[in-house]
Structures are given as structure tokens and as C-alpha cells.
Amino acid sequence: MNGNRFGRLFQVTTYGESHGEAMGVTVSGVPAGVELDEEAIQAQLDRRKPGQSMITTSRGEPDEVVVNSGVQDGYTTGTPIGMVIQNKDARSGKYEPYVTAPRPSHGDYTYSAKFGTRNWGGGGRSSARETVNWVAAGAVAEQVLDASEYDVEIKAHVNQIGDVEADDVSFEQILDHSEENDVRCADPEAAAEMQELIERYQEAGDSIGGSIYFECRGVPRGLGAPRFDGFPSRLGQAMFSIPATTGVEFGLGKDAVNVTGSERNEDWTFDDGESFDHVESEEGDPVPVGNDHGGLQGGITTGEPIYGEATWHAPTSIPKKQRSADWETGEEKDVQVVGRHDPVLPPRAVPVVEAMLYCTVLDFMLLAGRINPDRVDGNPGQYDTDYHPSSPDND
């Protein structure tokens, strides 16, 4: 099975199945000399882990990460970083009825049709359990960016569940308030309505979809390339790798269908040194007046905030009775998915979205030479045996 790696220079390779022994990720392309805080990695995993509230699955996974390579005395060595998260609360027995009778709208049949076999416990490789690897990788990417000269900030929050929409909020409000409720919505009134809606579907044995707003600040201009290597092209690929993603938008997104060219096109002016939020822009530089394009023009970053929205359909594992076709017996039959599952995805997907953004931004920064891919201090290829911060001579 291919398709388990993402990135060009900052490469993330994952493995593991939902009910296997462990989940794991190998991160290559991390420069040497980054002080890696393993507690910060764990903190991000804790934001994603199951069982954290009444509106998440009750599966009791501690999601404790073990970093087993690529780090010495707390600093990265430039070699691949390996991280492992053990699965400690898998219960595969409840999935035996679906071995030959695929659950509706899952990957059960398609995996079996393609490979002739599959790990059926908990959905195996197709499970959203796999996103724990991406969050670990994203936490590493965040720390590499923090160690650079660039002040990159990335944040997301749930802006819609079902028909309940949050009011538009500022980036600062998302930073300050998105973690204050179980839904991870920075609008407290909307969050309360969302929670009530989720619980109503949950009690009915059903599920509901939603969306997440994301924003990146401090990303310099000039990242990305035309066509297939454009910044939105690669970020879109990363977002669509998150299970159940049905749409990714940038800037005005789908609302652009109702906007004329003359309304959407943004005039250019000169930076006056006070009015614009553009990375690296100096007084007198040309800058676009607005940012309806979401910080992206021609597939390349403009230096303005990058923002957009990603959408998820309702979780497909629900206890409501549904119909399936058993390919072994040749009969149709009722199935009920009685395992432990989330009634909604966006609240736990927020750290996954942020992780995908961090991984993508760092990869582009390395590709553009904005960050030295060899080491956080010094020139690429510079030879210095005393460089590494853990060297005894640097005490």
C-alpha cells in the first residue's frame, strides 16, 4: 500500500491501524539543533485524544508519545525522528459482523476490493485514529518554525456544526477562546447551541457534520509554485487526507460564486508602513488592498494572512440500524455499528487541521530556502564538529 508519506523536504511517513499494536510516524527533514519539547508534542496529542468530553468517543486511549530516534539530549540531530503511540484500548470483537458485510459509507468494501484483504478491527488503516500521527508530526513542525526567525502562528476553530454557525471572530479571539468549550468554537453562544445539537443527534443514535475555520499568520510571501506545486494545491491535498473531509476553501471560498470580478479583484497600492499586515513588506512596497483571496495569488503566498475553511461530513459509524450486503452469504441484512465512535468530527479535528498547516508551511519554507534544512544555526553544508548544542564542549 502506497500513499503513506507526505511532503518534499519535511517528509511525514505514518503507519499503524486503529486496533493494531501501535500508531507510528517517522519525520524526516528536521534540521539539526532544534530544542525539541516532548511535553509540547504530548500537549497537542491530548487535544486530539479520544474520551476528552461527552461529545467524543469513549475509547480510553492515553495517546502517550514515545520519541525513539532523531533526538539527543533534547536536541534534534538532523536524522529521522521516530514517534510511537501505543493502542491500549482496542476492542475488535464488535467489528466481526462487518468482516464480509461492509458498513455503509466506510472503506470496508473498497479496501477489500482493492487489496483482497483488510485489517477490519476498528476500520484498520482507514480509521481517523491514524490522525494521531499527523498531530505528532505537526507538533514537531511547529517547534522547528518557532526555532526559526519567522513568527508563524496557526490557529483554527469550529465555525459550524449542522445548521448552527458561529459569528465571524478575530484571530485573537480564536487564540484566546477556542479552547474554552468542548466544541472548540471561539463564539461561546454558538458553542452552546452546537453542543446542544450534537447531544441531540447523539441521543438519537445519529451523527452530524461541521466545518473548521483556519488561519495562518507570519507566513512570508513567495512560497509555492504554479499549478501542481501551488501552496493551496499542496495544502488542499493535506486537508483532504484527513478522513471524512468533503471540502477545502481559501479566502471567499464558495461564496465567490456570487461575487463579480470587479468586486473580488483587489487593487494594488503602496505600503504606507502602518495600514497593512504583510510579512516582510516595507514602506513603499506594492501591496493588495484587501485579502479576499486568503493570502494566496497564483498559487503563491502574498505575505498576508492565509485563511480558509474545511468541511467534514457526519461520522459514518452510527448505532442506527442500516442495510448492508454480505458478499459471503449473498444476503442483505441489517447492521448496527455498536463500537465507540464520535457523534461529530470537527471538535477533535481542530488540532489535526493545525498540524496539517504546520507541516505544509514548514515544507514550503524548507523548499524555498527560508529555513536551513541542515541546521538551525549556520550555513547549509557548513562543517563544524563542535556545533551540536549537546556537545560536552558547549556546556
Swiss-Prot record:
| Cofactor info, note text | Reduced FMN (FMNH(2)).
Q: In which pathway does it act?
A: Metabolic intermediate biosynthesis; chorismate biosynthesis; chorismate from D-erythrose 4-phosphate and phosphoenolpyruvate: step 7/7
Q: Name one GO biological process term.
A: aromatic amino acid family biosynthetic process
Q: Which molecular function term from Gene Ontology is one that the record holds?
A: FMN binding
| Named cofactor requirement(s) | FMNH2
Q: Name one GO cellular component term.
A: cytosol
Enzyme class (EC, first level): lyase
Taxonomic superkingdom: Archaea
Q: NCBIfam families in the record, alphabetically?
A: aroC, PRK05382.1
HAMAP family assigned to the protein according to its UniProt record, in alphabetical order = Chorismate_synth (MF_00300)
Q: Can you say what this protein is called?
A: Chorismate synthase
Q: Which organism is it from?
A: Halorubrum lacusprofundi (strain ATCC 49239 / DSM 5036 / JCM 8891 / ACAM 34)
Give the source lineage, highest ranks first.
Archaea, Methanobacteriati, Methanobacteriota, Stenosarchaea group, Halobacteria
